[in-house]
């Protein structure tokens, strides 16, 4: 599995960058925001999400871990694929997107190409509670994703996350949350 690339940017287009790593050129799907920060001929370090489908092997690249986490979460929403997730990241920074979800600005979300009212509403419902407002947000988001990958729904996870002690390690928080969810 490819989780990162460090190499020289050979070519940049709106949603793709070609990165040369020791003689091999990788085509990496990127948001327009990421593409704007890359420079041809310069060294780049991208966090990679590798998606293997029946008909394609895709690499998605991110400069920031927060973008990658948001992208992975968006892909879990039924009706959101890589193209729409990249369109969201092209339109909003993770912080801007978090504010849109927190303030329930469905109309702003509908401005993203490929997102209509129905999908915007679905994204809002699925992501309410994903962004937790406290100093432990990155750890809480990881706990949320871990519990979700185990099959729990956000409606079950969110109340449990609020009861967790604030300074638990990610592993301890997952264990405690699982105990609460299974009781």
Swiss-Prot record:
Keywords: Cytoplasm, DNA damage, DNA recombination, DNA repair, DNA-binding. InterPro entries: DNA_helicase_Holl-junc_RuvA_I, Hlx-hairpin-Hlx_DNA-bd_motif, NA-bd_OB-fold, RuvA, RuvA_2-like, RuvA_C, RuvA_C_sf. CDD domains: UBA_RuvA_C (cd14332). Signal peptide: none annotated. It is found in: Cytoplasm. Its main location: cytoplasm. Residues 139 are annotated as: Flexible linker. Residues 64-139 are annotated as: Domain II. GO terms for biological process: DNA recombination; DNA repair. Disulfide bonds: none annotated. GO terms for cellular component: cytoplasm; Holliday junction helicase complex; Holliday junction resolvase complex. The keyword Metal-binding does not apply. One of its GO terms (molecular function) is four-way junction DNA binding. Residues 139-183 are annotated as: Domain III. It comes from the Bacteria. Has three domains with a flexible linker between the domains II and III and assumes an 'L' shape. Domain III is highly mobile and contacts RuvB. Homotetramer. Forms an RuvA(8)-RuvB(12)-Holliday junction (HJ) complex. HJ DNA is sandwiched between 2 RuvA tetramers; dsDNA enters through RuvA and exits via RuvB. An RuvB hexamer assembles on each DNA strand where it exits the tetramer. Each RuvB hexamer is contacted by two RuvA subunits (via domain III) on 2 adjacent RuvB subunits; this complex drives branch migration. In the full resolvosome a probable DNA-RuvA(4)-RuvB(12)-RuvC(2) complex forms which resolves the HJ. The RuvA-RuvB-RuvC complex processes Holliday junction (HJ) DNA during genetic recombination and DNA repair, while the RuvA-RuvB complex plays an important role in the rescue of blocked DNA replication forks via replication fork reversal (RFR). RuvA specifically binds to HJ cruciform DNA, conferring on it an open structure. The RuvB hexamer acts as an ATP-dependent pump, pulling dsDNA into and through the RuvAB complex. HJ branch migration allows RuvC to scan DNA until it finds its consensus sequence, where it cleaves and resolves the cruciform DNA. NCBIfam families: ruvA. Belongs to the RuvA family. This is Holliday junction branch migration complex subunit RuvA. It comes from Helicobacter pylori (strain J99 / ATCC 700824) (Campylobacter pylori J99). The lineage of its organism: Bacteria, Pseudomonadati, Campylobacterota, Epsilonproteobacteria, Campylobacterales. The gene is ruvA.
């Amino acid at each position: 599995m490819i989780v990162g690339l460090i190499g020289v940017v050979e070519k940049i287009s709106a949603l793709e960058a070609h990165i040369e790593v020791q003689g091999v050129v990788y085509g990496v799907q990127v948001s327009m925001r990421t593409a704007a920060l890359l420079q041809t001929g310069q060294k780049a370090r991208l966090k990679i999400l590798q998606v293997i489908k029946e008909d394609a092997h895709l690499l998605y690249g991110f400069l920031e871990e927060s973008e990658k986490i948001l992208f992975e979460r968006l892909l879990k929403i039924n009706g959101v694929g890589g193209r729409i997730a990249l369109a969201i990241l092209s339109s909003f920074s993770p912080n801007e997107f978090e504010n849109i979800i927190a303030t329930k600005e469905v109309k702003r979300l509908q401005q993203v190409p490929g997102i209509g009212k129905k999908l915007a509403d679905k994204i809002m419902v699925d992501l309410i509670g994903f962004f937790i407002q406290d100093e432990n947000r990155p750890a809480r988001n990881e706990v949320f994703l871990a519990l979700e990958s185990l099959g729990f729904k956000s409606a079950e996870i969110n109340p449990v996350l609020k009861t967790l002690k604030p300074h638990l390690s990610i592993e301890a928080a997952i264990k405690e949350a699982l105990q609460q969810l299974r009781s």
